[in-house]
Amino acid sequence: MGIQLIVFLGNPGAEYEETRHNAAWLLLTYLFPSIVLPWRCGCRGSIARIEGFEGSSEEVWLLKPLTYMNRSGKSVGAACAFLQTDAKQLLVVHDELELPFGVVSLKQGGGLGGHNGLRSIKEVLGTADFWRLRIGIGRPPSESVNIAQYVLSAFYPAEMAAFPKLGRATRDLLCQLVVTDQAATVTLLSAWRKKRLLSLCE
């Protein structure tokens, strides 16, 4: 079995909707444009089940923690317990400072890169050995810009306009992760280690 639970990290509230820290939530908006996701409240967040994911026979759950970023682990831990999901069946989609906008990176385990949402998940699960899909948001334009303020700043209009294409380009990877068994994932890790999906110059 591949990925069973996909978590999209972000902050609830209208003031955070288009901020860089909410890149995963913005991506989710454009991942499944042709279906209405059956969201319901649960596991300290919004959770939805998709049967026959992207035409496969697999079932996958989607989770948007509503605990705010720094407490994401409380929601993820509750969902993993409810679904009996282990770390190897968990994919966390999150913003990544070290990648430029338009670049995504698939990773399993490893360091947390100072990301408070990932840190919270590790603290609750007791392991960092879960999958991550890192969505590039780029670094601040100047070293004088505070990182905390930067990740809570809004995307530029050109970046916002690119999210539909970013969502379409990412959907294929998510489908492969859901239907691919653990033994075959090394190929995906290699292909998606650092992949540019779009350029704002296009």
UniProtKB/Swiss-Prot annotation:
Which UniProt keyword terms apply here?
Cytoplasm, Hydrolase, RNA-binding, tRNA-binding
Residue positions of the active site: 21
User: Could you tell me the EC number(s) of this protein?
Assistant: 3.1.1.29
Residues carrying the site annotation Stabilizes the basic form of H active site to accept a proton: 95
Gene Ontology biological process: protein quality control for misfolded or incompletely synthesized proteins; rescue of stalled ribosome
Q: Which Pfam families match?
A: Pept_tRNA_hydro (PF01195)
**GO cellular component annotations, sorted alphabetically?**
cytoplasm
Write out the catalysed reaction: an N-acyl-L-alpha-aminoacyl-tRNA + H2O = an N-acyl-L-amino acid + a tRNA + H(+)
Keyword Repeat listed: no
MF terms from GO for this chain are: peptidyl-tRNA hydrolase activity; tRNA binding
Predominant location category: cytoplasm
Q: How does it assemble?
A: Monomer.
Give the family per the record.
Belongs to the PTH family.
- NCBIfam families listed in its UniProt record: pth (TIGR00447)
Cross-referenced PANTHER family, in alphabetical order? PEPTIDYL-TRNA HYDROLASE
Q: What is the protein's given name?
A: Peptidyl-tRNA hydrolase
Q: What is the lineage of its organism?
A: Bacteria, Pseudomonadati, Spirochaetota, Spirochaetia, Spirochaetales
Point out the gene that encodes the protein. pth
